Amino acid sequence: LVTAVSWSTTYFPISQMGFKLRFVDINLDTLNIDVEALELAITQNTKAVMLVNLLGNPNEFDKIQKICDDYGLIMLEDNCESMGAAFNQKCAGTFGLIGSFSTYFSHHLCTMEGGINVTDDEELYHYMLSIRSHGWTRHLPDDSKIYKKLDDPFYESFNFIMPGYNIRPLEIEAATGIEQLKKLNSFIKQRRKNAIA
């Protein structure tokens, strides 16, 4: 299940992985997913909920987490527009199994292109490391949770274990992002001033 209002990059990765999208209406006061409509949209085939914390507004995570727990659903978050937002003292983007953040132009941090995914699931993290790099084993740690690496650097340099993409960040993007992190609090403060104006 996905919210009906977002950017295409919220939806395309789900579709590219072969999952069926089902759109859920929004709450007009928050522009986030309507919690009542969310629960009504759940079927026996529903596997996950992709939330978008739109324009600095965190979702109603207490209610949505209960729904996900009751129905055995995975919660994912697109937090591209809400870096620094919090719900009950916890940062938006850290409630779901994965939280995604964009570093494209006009977002809180800009590295020209790219983004950040966060998770506390180590196995999933290892899958993401491989997928971002063509499905290679090269960038996996020696104690990988998804693949037993051989003690042969040549072999691992050319071993692909799954379909993947070429979405590794460039060093210049990382350097830009590190410098902007130092200014993140002031960026957020200015965005909040702009929202009130």
Predicted regions and their residues:
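A generic hydrophobic-helix recognition signal that picks specific residues
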Residues: T46, D70-G72, K90, G114, ...
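Active-site region of PLP-dependent enzymes
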Residues: S82-N88, F95-A197
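PLP-dependent aminotransferase-like
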Residues: L1-D70, I74-N79, A86
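Short, hinge-like loop/turn segments at secondary-structure boundaries
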Residues: E39-A41, I67, C91-F95, N117
